[in-house]
C-alpha cells in the first residue's frame, strides 16, 4: 500500500495529543454534545471524518489503512494516544529503578490504561499515527507501546511532564526515545568502566579492612557515583568548560577525592594513620578538619581534554555547601576587568551538587538555592544535581523523612528534568549523566539525576544498621556489588573472560598495597595542645592610609550626580541626590550613603571590583542609597557607578530574593573564588541575619582556621534600638563577638560617615593578601542622616580608619576625670546628642566618653593610652542599648577588668537580662534609653538603684 497525497488530506498533519484532540472534536461534531472549534468544524464539513493512513508491511505487524470513519474506533485511537502520553508521564511508576526492590508492580493508572487495549487493537493502528517520530522498524501502535515501555519502564525512568517549555520537553523525549542515549558502549569503554568500579570497590574494602572502626562514610551501594561524575566532568571538558565545581557531603567523599580528584591513595592512607608523607599538600587551616570534610582542586584530563575540578570544603551541616559552590561558579564565569556590570560566560564553569536522599527534601537551604537558579544575580547557567540515594537517612527510613514519592520531587517545582536510575546498571547511569550534561550545556538550566542504590554499611562504619533496618540489611548482605554484577555482564557478553576480570581486581589490590607501603608510621612528634595561628593573621590589620584627595572626591561626586540626557529620575530621588551636590565643599556635610558611594567609586578606580547584594540593596532598605536609578517613563535603570571615568573594574549591585542563608553562602563562595573582589551582603534588617547563622558559624568565621579558605566578605547588618520592637532592633552582635577569635574577622559598629568610608577602603586594600579577613559591620538606620554622623570632605581626604574615637570637648581637664564611659554605635551617638544638647546639668569635667568603633579586635593599646591620661580615674563603665545578656557586654567585661587594673572599678549600664532583644512599646523604649544616657553621664549616680528600669552596677 502506498501513502495518499497528503496535500488533499488535512488530517495527515495531526499526530499524538493533537490527533486525540481532533478526534474528540469530531465526536462532539457528530453527536452535537458540545461546542466545536470553528476551524475544525469547517474541515469536518468539507472533508468528513478524520482519516489516517501509513505505509505498512504484511504479516502480524501489518497496520491496514485505518480510519475512524471506516472502523468507528474513535475511542480506541484516543486510548492509544492517551496510553502513549501516560507511558511518557508515568512510566517511572513501573520502572525497576531500585536495586533493593523488584520491578514496580500493582494496579497503577498506566497499567489500567494498558489493560483496556488488546494487541489486536494496537496492531490495527499505524505507528506514525500516534508517534510521528517513530524510528525505523516501528510499524504499528503495538510496536510503539513495546518500544516506549522499553525506554520508560526499565532501569532508567524519566519525569519530564512537569517541564513547562514545550521545546525542552520535546528535546528530552526525543533524546530518550531515539537510540542516541543508549548506544552500546565500545568494549574499550566497558572495560574502562569495570576498572573504575573495581578501583572504587577495592579502595573502600581496603579502608574497611585496614582501618577497622574508623569513620569513612563509604560510597558502597552507590559506587556508580564516581563514574557518573567522571562522565559529567569529561563531557563538560569536551564542551570547553574550564572549571567544574562540586559540592557534596561526607557520604562517598573519600572515594570522590581519590578517584575523581586524583588524590593519591598514599595521602589518603596517611590521613587515616595520622602520618606525614612527602609530597602531601596541606589543604587545611591551623586547626584543621576531619578528612571527609576536606576539599581539593585538581586539573583532570584524559587523552583529549582537561578541566579544573574543585571539590568544596564542607561541614557536616548537610546541603549548606550548595550556595557556596554556586558562588564559586558565578565568580569563575565572570570577567570583572571592565567598568559596568561584569561579563558572564556560563560555558566557562558549571556546578555538580551531590545531595543525600534525606537531606534534599529535608533541608530548607536546598529550596533556597534552587530558587537562585533562574535569578539574574545568581544564575550560573544550570547545575547538575545528583541525589546519591541510599534510601535511608542515618537510621530514618524514607517514609519518615519525606512527604513525597521520590526524594527528588522538590525539583519539580523548579521546572527541573528528573531521571531516576538504578545504581546497579552502570551503562544506564552513564546514559543519565550524558543526558544531564547535554541538557545543561544546551538549555543552561538545572538537571537532576536520582541515583538510586543502597548503603552497604551503617551511617558510619561503627554503626550496625540491622538494628533499625533488619529486613533490608538481610537483602543487602546477600546482594552482589555493582562491580560483580557488571563483571558478570561483561563475561556473558564475551567482552572479558574470568581471568581478565581477576587480573583487573589483582592490579587494583597491588596498587593499594603498594601505596599503603609508602606511608610511614604515625607521627605524633608535633602533637600539641596549642595551635599556632599564622603570624600574618595574629598581627591583625596594620594601619592603612585610606584617604582620597579632595579634588578626586569632588570629581567622583560630580559623576555620581549625572545621568544620561533624557533619563527621567524620580523627582523625590532627584532632590535627595541634588542635596549632595555641595557636600564636599567647605561647609558641606557628607551623609552615610554618599560616603559609601564615594568609597565605592574610589575603590573601583583603584582596580577592585565590587559586588553588593541584599533584599533592597539597590535603593537601600531605608531609602538612602539610590545607587540604581529608575526612569519614571520607561522603567529603565542606570547606575552612575557604571559610567565614571578611569575605572577598569566591574560594579554590580543586585536586589536578592527573600533569603538569607542561601544568599550569604553564595556571596561567601563568590568571594572565596574571586578574592580580589569586594563582596558585600546586606541584611534588610540585622535581626534577620540569624537565619544564615549556620553560614556564619561553619564558613565565614571558621573557614580559614579549618580549611585555610580565605574570605574578605563584608556583612552589612542594620542594628540599633529605636523603639521598633524585637524584630527590627538587633543584629545580635553578641553572636559575632562570641565567634571572634584568632583575628578571624573584624566586628565594627561605627558612628560617622567618614569611618564607614575608611573601613570600606581598608577592607578593599587587604583583599587578595594574607591579611584578608571578613568584615562584620553593624550599620545604622536612624543614624544614616543623623547630624552627628555627618562628615566633612577633609575627614575623607585625610587619615584612616580609627578603631576608637574620643568624644569631642570632653576630658579637657584630665585630673578631674573620674569616669570613663565606653560605648559603641547608636548608643555612643545618643550619649553625644545628650552632651551637646545641654538640656541637663552634668559635671562633664568628671566624665570622658570613648566610642569603640572596632569591637573586635579590640583596640586595647588605644584605649589604654587614653586611660593613662586620667590619673584620678575611679571607674570604667560599659554602656549599651541591648539587654545585659546581649550586645557586647559579656565580650567587653573581661577586657574592661584587664584595662582597669586593681584600683579602678568596672561597671555596666544598660537594660537588664531579657529573653527578647527589645520591647515592643516605643514609649517604654524611649524612657529606658533616657535613663541609660542619664545614668551614664551622671557620676554621682548611686549604683544599684532603679534596677527594675535598667541594670546598673559595678564590680
Swiss-Prot record:
Its EC number is 1.2.4.2. It comes from Bacillus cereus (strain B4264). E1 component of the 2-oxoglutarate dehydrogenase (OGDH) complex which catalyzes the decarboxylation of 2-oxoglutarate, the first step in the conversion of 2-oxoglutarate to succinyl-CoA and CO(2). GO terms for biological process: glycolytic process; tricarboxylic acid cycle. Belongs to the alpha-ketoglutarate dehydrogenase family. InterPro entries: 2oxoglutarate_DH_E1, 2oxoglutarate_DH_E1_bac, DH_E1, KGD_C_sf, ODO-1/KGD_C, THDP-binding, Transketolase-like_Pyr-bd. It catalyses: N(6)-[(R)-lipoyl]-L-lysyl-[protein] + 2-oxoglutarate + H(+) = N(6)-[(R)-S(8)-succinyldihydrolipoyl]-L-lysyl-[protein] + CO2. This is 2-oxoglutarate dehydrogenase E1 component.
Amino acid at each position: 500500500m502506498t501513502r495518499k497525497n497528503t496535500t488533499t488530506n488535512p488530517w495527515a498533519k495531526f499526530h499524538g495529543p493533537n490527533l486525540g484532540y481532533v478526534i474528540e472534536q469530531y465526536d462532539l461534531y457528530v453527536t452535537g454534545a458540545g461546542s466545536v472549534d470553528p476551524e475544525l468544524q469547517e474541515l469536518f464539513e468539507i472533508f468528513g471524518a478524520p482519516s489516517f493512513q501509513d505505509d505498512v508491511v504484511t504479516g502480524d505487524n501489518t497496520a491496514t489503512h485505518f480510519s475512524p470513519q471506516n472502523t468507528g474506533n474513535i475511542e480506541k485511537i484516543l486510548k492509544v494516544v492517551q496510553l502513549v502520553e501516560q507511558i511518557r508521564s508515568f512510566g517511572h511508576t513501573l520502572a525497576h529503578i531500585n536495586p533493593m526492590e523488584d520491578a514496580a508492580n500493582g494496579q497503577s493508572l498506566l497499567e489500567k490504561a494498558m489493560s483496556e487495549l488488546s494487541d489486536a487493537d494496537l496492531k490495527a493502528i499505524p505507528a506514525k499515527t500516534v508517534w510521528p517520530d517513530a524510528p525505523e522498524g516501528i510499524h504499528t501502535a503495538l510496536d510503539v507501546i513495546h518500544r516506549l515501555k522499553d525506554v520508560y519502564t526499565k532501569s532508567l525512568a524519566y519525569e519530564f511532564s512537569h517541564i513547562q517549555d514545550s521545546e525542552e520537553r520535546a528535546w528530552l523525549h526525543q533524546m530518550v526515545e531515539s537510540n542516541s542515549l543508549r548506544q552500546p558502549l565500545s568494549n574499550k569503554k566497558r572495560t574502562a568502566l569495570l576498572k573504575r568500579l573495581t578501583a572504587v570497590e577495592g579502595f573502600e574494602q581496603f579502608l574497611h579492612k585496614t582501618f577497622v572502626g574508623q569513620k569513612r562514610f563509604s560510597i558502597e551501594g552507590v559506587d556508580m557515583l564516581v563514574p557518573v561524575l567522571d562522565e559529567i566532568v569529561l563531557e563538560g571538558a569536551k564542551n570547553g568548560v574550564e572549571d567544574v565545581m562540586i559540592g557534596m557531603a561526607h557520604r562517598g567523599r573519600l572515594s570522590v577525592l581519590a578517584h575523581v580528584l586524583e588524590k593519591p591513595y598514599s595521602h589518603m592512607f596517611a590521613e587515616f594513620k595520622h602520618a606525614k608523607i612527602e609530597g602531601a599538600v596541606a589543604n587545611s587551616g591551623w586547626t584543621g578538619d576531619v578528612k571527609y570534610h576536606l576539599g581539593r582542586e585538581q586539573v583532570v584530563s584524559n587523552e583529549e581534554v582537561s578541566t579544573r575540578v574543585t571539590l568544596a570544603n564542607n561541614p557536616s551541616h548537610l546541603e549548606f555547601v550548595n550556595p557556596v559552590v554556586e558562588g564559586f561558579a558565578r565568580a569563575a564565569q565572570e570577567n570583572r576587568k571592565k567598568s559596568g556590570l561584569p561579563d558572564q560566560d556560563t560555558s566557562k564553569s558549571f556546578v555538580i551538587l551531590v545531595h543525600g536522599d534525606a537531606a534534599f527534601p529535608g533541608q530548607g537551604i536546598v529550596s533556597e538555592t534552587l530558587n537562585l537558579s533562574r535569578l539574574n544575580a545568581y544564575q550560573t547557567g544550570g547545575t547538575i544535581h545528583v541525589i546519591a540515594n541510599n534510601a535511608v537517612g542515618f537510621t530514618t527510613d524514607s517514609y519518615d523523612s519525606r512527604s513525597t514519592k521520590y526524594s527528588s520531587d522538590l525539583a519539580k517545582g523548579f521546572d527541573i528534568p528528573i531521571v531516576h536510575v538504578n545504581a546497579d546498571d552502570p551503562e544506564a547511569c552513564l546514559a543519565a549523566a550524558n543526558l544531564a550534561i547535554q541538557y545543561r550545556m544546551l538549555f543552561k538550566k538545572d538537571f537532576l539525576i536520582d541515583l538510586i542504590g543502597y548503603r552497604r554499611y551503617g551511617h558510619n562504619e561503627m554503626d550496625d544498621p540491622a538494628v533499625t533496618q533488619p529486613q533490608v540489611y538481610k537483602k543487602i548482605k546477600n546482594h552482589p556489588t555493582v562491580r560483580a554484577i557488571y563483571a558478570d555482564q561483561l563475561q556473558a557478553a564475551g567482552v572479558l573472560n574470568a581471568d581478565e576480570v581477576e587480573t583487573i581486581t589483582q592490579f587494583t589490590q597491588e596498587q593499594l598495597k603498594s601505596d599503603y607501603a609508602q606511608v610511614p608510621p604515625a607521627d605524633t612528634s608535633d602533637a600539641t595542645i596549642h595551635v599556632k595561628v599564622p603570624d600574618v593573621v595574629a598581627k591583625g590589620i596594620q594601619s592603612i592610609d585610606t584617604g582620597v584627595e579632595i579634588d578626586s572626591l569632588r570629581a567622583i561626586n560630580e559623576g555620581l550626580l549625572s545621568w544620561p540626557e533624557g533619563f527621567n529620575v524620580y523627582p523625590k530621588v532627584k532632590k535627595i541626590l541634588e542635596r549632595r551636590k555641595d557636600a564636599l565643599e567647605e561647609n558641606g556635610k557628607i551623609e552615610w550613603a554618599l560616603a559609601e558611594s564615594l568609597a565605592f567609586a574610589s575603590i573601583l578606580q583603584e582596580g577592585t571590583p565590587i559586588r553588593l547584594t541584599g533584599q533592597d540593596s539597590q535603593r537601600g532598605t531605608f531609602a538612602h542609597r539610590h545607587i540604581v536609578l529608575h526612569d519614571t517613563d520607561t522603567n529603565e535603570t542606570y547606575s552612575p557607578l557604571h559610567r565614571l571615568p578611569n575605572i577598569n573594574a566591574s560594579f554590580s549591585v543586585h536586589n536578592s530574593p527573600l533569603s538569607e542563608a542561601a544568599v550569604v553562602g553564595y556571596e561567601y563562595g563568590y568571594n572565596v573564588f574571586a578574592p580580589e573582589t569586594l563582596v558585600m551582603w546586606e541584611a534588610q534588617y540585622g535581626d534577620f541575619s540569624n537565619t544564615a547563622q549556620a553560614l556564619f558559624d561553619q564558613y565565614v568565621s571558621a573557614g580559614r582556621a579549618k580549611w585555610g579558605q580565605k574570605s574578605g566578605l563584608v556583612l552589612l547588618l542594620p542594628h540599633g534600638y529605636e523603639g521598633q520592637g524585637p524584630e527590627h532592633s538587633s543584629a545580635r552582635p553578641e553572636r559575632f563577638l562570641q565567634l571572634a577569635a584568632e583575628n578571624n574577622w573584624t566586628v565594627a559598629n561605627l558612628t560617622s560617615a567618614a569611618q564607614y568610608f575608611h573601613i570600606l577602603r581598608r577592607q578593599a586594600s587587604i583583599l587578595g593578601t594574607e591579611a584578608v579577613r571578613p568584615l562584620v559591620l553593624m550599620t545604622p538606620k536612624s543614624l544614616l542622616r543623623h547630624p552627628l554622623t555627618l562628615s566633612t570632605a577633609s575627614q575623607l581626604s585625610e587619615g584612616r580608619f580609627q578603631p576608637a574615637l574620643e568624644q569631642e570637648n570632653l576630658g579637657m581637664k584630665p585630673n578631674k576625670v573620674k569616669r570613663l564611659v565606653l560605648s559603641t554605635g547608636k548608643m555612643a551617638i545618643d550619649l553625644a546628642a545628650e552632651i551637646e544638647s545641654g538640656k541637663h546639668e552634668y559635671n562633664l569635667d568628671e566624665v570622658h566618653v570613648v566610642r569603640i568603633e572596632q569591637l573586635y579586635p579590640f583596640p586595647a593599646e588605644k584605649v589604654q593610652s587614653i586611660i593613662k591620661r586620667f590619673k584620678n580615674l575611679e571607674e570604667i563603665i560599659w554602656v549599651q542599648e541591648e539587654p545585659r545578656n546581649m550586645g557586647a557586654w559579656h565580650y567587653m567585661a573581661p577586657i574592661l577588668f584587664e584595662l582597669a587594673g586593681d584600683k579602678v572599678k568596672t561597671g555596666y549600664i544598660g537594660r537588664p537580662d531579657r529573653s527578647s532583644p527589645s520591647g515592643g512599646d516605643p514609649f517604654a523604649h524611649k524612657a529606658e534609653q533616657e535613663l541609660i544616657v542619664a545614668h551614664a553621664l551622671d557620676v554621682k549616680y548611686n549604683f544599684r538603684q532603679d534596677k527594675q528600669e535598667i541594670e546598673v552596677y559595678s564590680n
